[in-house]
């Protein structure tokens, strides 16, 4: 039994957990405002908000419901476009802004934009812009400037939001209907009576976190299966720190990493790096464990954590754990060191010191919302101009996310200089084996590999490394 609140209605259903949330909303509940578009999580027409209990409040995030399993709604508040309408058919502030700025054309994309903007209004992160919030929404009529103007109008109104009681303020000012205020207590009561949907199948079944990859390819198959849902498993969530180590449970999302202040302290450009990873909705869904197990040769988070020399904790159905180095996890294309009754539980890495430097680079056909042609990350320790540790990784240049063993080994013990970087790049070219595909020819990818490798050093050591000398 899956139990959650859909807009203002308590839902108790025995529909299969693998059915998409979008199909349940439209076909079982006849709420047609949430649109069917790409069914790949790219266009945002199916955007809904997911409210997750957080102490005595609810944290809302936008997701694409077309690739989200229904079972993940268990114990949550799901909000569609119908759920943010005000009584007596009055328009809320976001809807008024869209109308007054002529931001609707054919109207197909409009519900998704309005829901994403409502998520922005509910978000208390001052560094997030309205454009960030709608980054995963596509307007096929290309009415973006009018939509951006609506976003600017909403942003100006939100400058007066009461940070001490944000939900009350949003209701009072007409952003949300007043039933939102009752959701925390209603969800709490529901959770006391509901089980964990993650227990609906054994670990020998198909395991799904938030579905951002597997539902793109196998949504129809997943709808028929009794899948093992991991997203609501509390033992797989959370970020923790010890004196020298950061540990992230496998269901930690990209957004949770991006918003973590301690991680940002270690990686000042963390937001800049991770804004290159997918869209707002997918970052809210995509987990690091899922990215690793997806085993894509160009998985952004795999490349990121390979460069941190991360370790993985793997657990079987009996609770027995084992640890391996992340660079030993991927064996071949889509082949990795995980048995059928095992799950990836935790990722850990040593936190950087003052002499450690980190950088992430990505080249794709579009700067944002695209799969990389080649991506790369590098972590390097330098003491007295001597490289004491090096961990560089690269995606799109091999059958697996590539940890550059030979390149890293060469760098250790060398002086940081243009000549060292040039020689290391020659070794890199011998390590990689790119192929020609839709994202570029093998020759092009080798050029990108060189440029991104150089870019790490130019970004981290601009006073010591000279591009002209590297390319001379």
Task: Name each model feature, range by range.
Residues 1-9:
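Eukaryote-biased recognition of intrinsically disordered, low-complexity regulatory segments
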Residues 10, 49-50, 62, 93-99, ...:
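C-terminal structural segment of proteins
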Residues 10-18:
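Short, contiguous acidic and Ser/Thr-rich linear segments
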Residues 17-48:
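A basic, amphipathic helix-loop patch mediating RNA/tRNA/ribosome contacts
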Residues 31, 36-39, 59, 99-102, ...:
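Residue-level signal for mature regions of secreted extracellular proteins and peptides
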Residues 38, 43-46, 66, 106-109, ...:
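Short cysteine clusters
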Residues 50-80:
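S4-like RNA-binding module at protein N-termini
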Residues 75, 79-101:
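NAD(P)H dinucleotide-binding glycine-rich loop of Rossmann-like/cofactor-binding domains
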């Amino acid at each position: 039994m899956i139990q959650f609140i859909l807009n203002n209605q308590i839902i108790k259903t025995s529909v299969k957990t693998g059915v998409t949330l979008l199909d349940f909303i439209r076909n079982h509940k006849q709420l047609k405002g949430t649109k069917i578009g790409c069914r790949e999580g790219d266009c945002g027409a199916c955007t809904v908000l997911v409210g997750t209990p957080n102490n005595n409040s609810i944290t809302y995030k936008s997701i694409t419901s077309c690739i989200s399993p229904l079972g993940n709604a268990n114990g949550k508040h799901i909000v569609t476009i119908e759920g943010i309408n005000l009584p007596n058919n009055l328009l809320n502030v976001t809807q008024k802004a869209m109308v007054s700025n002529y931001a609707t054309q054919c109207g197909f994309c409009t519900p998704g934009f309005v829901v994403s903007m409502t998520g922005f209004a509910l978000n208390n992160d001052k560094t997030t812009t309205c454009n960030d919030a709608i980054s995963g929404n596509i307007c096929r009529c290309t009415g973006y400037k009018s939509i951006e103007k609506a976003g600017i109008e909403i942003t100006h109104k939100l400058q007066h939001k009461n940070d001490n009681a944000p939900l009350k303020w949003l209701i009072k000012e007409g952003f949300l209907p007043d039933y939102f205020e009752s959701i925390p207590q209603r969800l709490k009561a529901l959770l006391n009576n509901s089980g964990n949907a993650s227990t609906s199948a054994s670990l020998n079944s198909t395991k799904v976190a938030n579905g951002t990859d597997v539902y793109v390819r196998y949504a129809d198959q997943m709808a028929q299966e009794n899948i093992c849902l991991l997203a609501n498993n509390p033992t797989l969530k959370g970020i923790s720190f010890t004196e020298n180590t950061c540990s992230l449970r496998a269901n930690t999302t990209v957004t949770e990493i991006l918003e973590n202040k301690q991680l940002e302290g270690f990686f000042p450009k963390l937001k800049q790096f991770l804004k290159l990873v997918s869209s707002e909705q997918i970052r809210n869904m995509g987990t690091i464990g899922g990215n690793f197990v997806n085993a894509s040769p160009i998985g952004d988070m795999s490349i990121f954590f390979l460069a941190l020399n991360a370790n993985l904790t793997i657990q079987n159905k009996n609770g027995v754990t084992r640890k391996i180095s992340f660079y030993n996890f991927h064996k071949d294309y889509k082949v990795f060191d995980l048995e059928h009754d095992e799950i990836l539980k935790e990722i850990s890495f040593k936190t950087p010191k003052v002499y450690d430097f980190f950088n992430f680079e990505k080249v794709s056909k579009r700067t944002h919302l695209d799969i990389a042609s080649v991506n790369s990350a590098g972590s390097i320790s330098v003491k007295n101009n001597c490289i004491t540790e090096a961990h560089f990784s690269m995606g799109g240049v091999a059958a697996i996310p590539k940890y550059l063993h030979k390149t890293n080994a060469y760098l250790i013990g060398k002086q940081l200089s243009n000549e060292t970087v040039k020689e290391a790049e020659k070794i890199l070219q011998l390590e990689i084996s790119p192929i020609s595909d839709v994202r570029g020819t093998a020759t092009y990818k080798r050029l990108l590999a060189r440029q991104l490798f150089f870019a790490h050093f130019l970004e981290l050591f601009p006073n010591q490394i000279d591009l002209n000398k590297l390319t001379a």
